[in-house]
Amino acid sequence: MCKNLVEKGNLDKPLIIFNRTTKRATDLKERIPSGKSIVVLNIEEAVSKSDIVFTCLGDDLAVKDTLATAVKGDVKGKLFVDCSTIHPDTTNELAKSVEEHGAHFVACPGTPSTCSRPCKKLILDQQYSEHPQWLRTANWSAF
């Protein structure tokens, strides 16, 4: 996903990469064209420098912990896109928390069983039509 964002997205600034295992983030950076990404060492820095934050984590607890840390800073107006495959109740809980902090939340899980491709496209198209500024210059991060 990061490689596609960098190669096919219209990014004016480098993609910000964070991983709980720093080596994974630096390994990913090495696979992306030079100058197109930077690695940060903590969630707070990634979120503070970003307008759009993608998360893709292994389980419900990891997503909850990550977003709980992410919303501690100023997230007003930011867009969080979670691509993790987690329980719908967890997704609803996370959406509520993110929105209570003044940010926006889109669930875009990675498996068709949870949300089919047309459904994902519809969700994203709806979000972008309501918030066209997200299609313009933005700082993106992924973790």
Each language-model region and where it sits:
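Rossmann-fold NAD(P) dinucleotide-binding segment
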Residues: 43-106
